[in-house]
From Swiss-Prot:
Source organism per UniProt: Helicobacter pylori (strain G27)
GO biological process assignments: putrescine biosynthetic process from arginine
KW Hydrolase (keyword) present: yes
Keyword Hydrolase set for record: yes
Catalytic activity: formamide + H2O = formate + NH4(+)
GO MF, one example: formamidase activity
Cystine residue pairs: none
Residues annotated as domain CN hydrolase: 14-260
Record-given protein name: Formamidase
Family: Belongs to the carbon-nitrogen hydrolase superfamily. Aliphatic amidase family.
Top-rank taxon, per record: Bacteria
Length: 334
């Protein structure tokens, strides 16, 4: 259910807070250090204002910003784990909360582009999940495609958490992958500008509904002298309805109560519209156990490394040249 300014921990489930962090204007390493201090200060203030909160989420790019002229430079990149994530870990341990943070991560292979990474830190100060963005926002983003799959970890109140990053949420197969691995609360951290505001809302709801899981999503908010970032933190129920919807205000804290057991129960007890089950058991009324092969060509082709669209040879944009990244396979920005 939605939170009417709730401050306490629900008897079952947990309270989440999603921070519509102001889009950072970052021109130097000092600006990044300032952002980290601001994030930590905000985490502690949120815990003080909402004593029952157990999970606090910060959006994509909140640590290092979106200075596209510098975001690939060594000065702007961080390691995971590293001294900056240790600061986040210390804050989570002090506040006794789970935290979700965004890091543009230096690639261990210096000949390849950096990763766009999200981490979950538990109340003991341990990184319990590390995710590298699988689907960078082509053709704008130069991040190397993630190589860690879609991990799932235990969270508060019986939750099983997964994180996707921004454009990942537009890929329905990725939400299904998280659910297939047991996720019942799917987190989305984003740095979208207003061009896809409606689609953001739509996909947060559809990812919840198609997979019978909660979604908790938060975007940067404010203006960076180029784009406006829409905020619009959103918490969706496992039936696809919106429980809480934020506005476009920087610093807005979107809170809501989440009951993972209700999503788990729906997965166990629903017949109609239990679509994540039906995908692998189609027609089980007529055939015991149903048909296990969905017969979907694109899944077979994707698994075989043969995925190709009928119009692919005629597509106009298939590399990063339009944004100054002529794709050669080498490292940009060194």
């Amino acid at each position: 259910m939605g939170s009417i300014g709730s401050m306490g921990k629900p008897i079952e489930g947990f309270l989440v807070a999603a921070i519509q962090f102001p889009v950072p204007i970052v021109n130097s390493r000092k600006d990044i250090d300032h952002n980290i201090e601001s994030i930590i200060r905000t985490l502690h203030a949120t815990k003080a204002g909402y004593p029952g909160v157990e999970l606090i989420i910060f959006p994509e790019y909140s640590t290092q910003g979106l200075n596209t002229a510098k975001w690939l430079s060594e000065e702007f990149l961080l390691d995971v784990p590293g001294k900056e994530t240790e600061l986040y870990a210390k804050a989570c341990k002090e506040a006794k909360v789970y935290g979700v943070f965004s890091i543009m991560e230096r690639n261990p292979d210096s000949n390849k582009n950096p990763y766009n990474t999200a981490i979950i830190i538990d109340p003991q100060g341990k990184i319990i999940l590390k995710y590298r963005k699988l689907f960078p926002w082509n053709p704008i983003e130069p991040w190397y495609p993630g190589d860690l799959g879609m991990p799932v970890c235990e969270g508060p109140g019986g939750s099983k958490l997964a994180v996707c990053i921004c454009h990942d949420g537009m890929i329905p197969e990725l939400a299904r992958e998280a659910a297939y691995k047991g996720c019942n609360v799917y987190i989305r951290i984003s740095g979208y500008s207003t061009q896809v505001n409606d689609q953001w809302i739509l996909t947060n709801r559809s990812n919840a509904w198609h997979n019978l899981m909660y979604t908790v999503s938060v975007n940067l908010a404010g203006y960076d002298n180029v784009f406006y970032y829409f905020g619009e933190g959103q918490i969706c129920n496992f039936d696809g309805t919106t429980l809480v919807q934020g506005h476009r205000n920087p610093w807005e804290i979107v809170t809501g109560e989440i009951y993972p057991k209700m999503a788990d129960n729906a997965r166990l007890s629903w017949g109609l519209e239990n679509n994540i089950y039906n995908l692998g058991h189609r027609g089980y009324v007529a055939k015991p156990g149903g048909e296990h092969d969905a017969g979907l060509t694109y899944i077979k082709d994707l698994a075989a490394g043969k995925y190709k669209l009928p119009w692919e040879d005629h597509m106009k944009i298939k590399d990063g040249s339009i944004y100054g990244y002529p794709t050669t396979g080498g490292r940009f920005g060194k």
